[in-house]
Each structure stands twice: as structure tokens, then as C-alpha cells.
């Protein structure tokens, strides 16, 4: 999810991945966009992490206001796509997911999806030769199918699974 923060989960074989701690996708470190006025981001823990560069508060700091009022072609969204695409690229080469689902308040701006998909492919530089990724990117990097109640369904399923395992 991309909203006031950035959260991510990894599901393998129907089970969420949990090792030393839960995946902290939001704190992966990224390269700054050359036109970013806040290249270190707003995270109090890490300079240049995904959450500090791409969550809602970072977008607001970048435009010094409420980004919800901006037009889709505002340059801030190319910067946003640059950071989200780095996350996608990192996940593709490390986790090799079958699908990347991007939800949350920031991702309600549907114009971001084409920008993120295009930038992800550019960043991969032809390294990953997958038909699913190269020719069906619209079905690979997607919004949640159950939006706006996807979070509720996820919580329900986690609770149900916990009860079954108790």
C-alpha cells in the first residue's frame, strides 16, 4: 500500500512471508530522482528510503501542499513513478513475484499505473525476459481487485487463518 506510509507483504503458496521480522518494503533504499527537490525524503530513520520518498507525506512536502488537487500531468507524479518503479524492479529481481498489487490512497490516482509500469520496464533494462512482464504489464502491476474493501478482506482472511491454526 502507498498512503501515509508504505507497507508491503509477500505471499508464497498462500502464506505470508515472515522471517526475522515482517517485510519492510517501505524502507528499501533508492536512488534519488535528479529533479526531486527533497532527494533525501522525509523518513526520520533513513535518508532515501521508499517510504520517505514516495508515501503521501513526501509528495505533500515536494509540492508544499495537497497533491490530491494536482492534475495527472504534474511533474511530481513522474518523480513518484520513478520511486515506485524502483520498488517494483527490486521486488522483481529479488522475490520474482507472480504479480505486484499497488493499493492505498496514493494509488487511487490511476494515471500513476502507466508511469510506474513504463519506468519499471526501463529500469529492468531488458534483464528479465518474461512474456508476462514484457507483453502483459497491465496485468502484472495492478490495483487491488477488491478495492475499496481489500484491506478488510485481508484482515478477515488473516483472522480466519489464525483461528484455524489455533
Regions found by a protein language model. Give the residues of each.
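ATP-binding/phosphotransfer module of carbohydrate and carboxylate kinases, centering on a glycine-rich
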Residues: 32-166
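Glycine-rich phosphate-binding loop of actin/hexokinase-like ATP-binding domains
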Residues: 1-51
Amino acid at each position: 500500500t502507498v498512503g501515509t506510509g508504505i507497507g508491503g507483504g509477500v505471499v508464497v503458496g498462500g502464506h505470508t512471508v515472515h522471517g526475522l521480522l515482517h517485510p519492510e518494503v517501505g524502507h528499501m533504499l533508492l536512488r534519488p530522482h535528479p529533479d526531486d527537490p527533497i532527494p533525501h525524503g522525509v523518513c526520520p530513520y533513513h535518508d532515501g528510503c521508499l517510504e520517505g520518498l514516495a508515501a503521501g507525506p513526501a509528495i505533500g512536502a515536494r509540492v508544499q501542499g495537497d497533491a490530491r488537487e494536482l492534475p495527472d500531468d504534474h511533474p511530481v507524479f513522474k518523480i513518484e513513478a520513478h520511486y515506485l518503479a524502483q520498488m517494483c524492479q527490486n521486488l522483481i529481481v529479488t522475490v520474482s513475484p507472480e504479480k505486484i498489487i499497488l493499493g492505498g490512497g496514493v494509488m487511487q490516482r490511476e494515471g500513476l499505473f502507466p508511469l510506474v509500469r513504463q519506468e519499471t520496464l526501463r529500469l529492468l533494462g531488458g534483464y528479465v525476459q518474461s512474456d508476462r512482464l514484457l507483453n502483459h504489464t497491465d496485468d502484472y502491476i495492478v490495483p487491488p481487485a477488491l478495492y475499496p474493501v481489500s484491506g478488510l478482506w485481508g484482515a478477515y482472511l488473516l483472522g480466519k487463518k489464525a483461528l484455524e491454526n489455533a
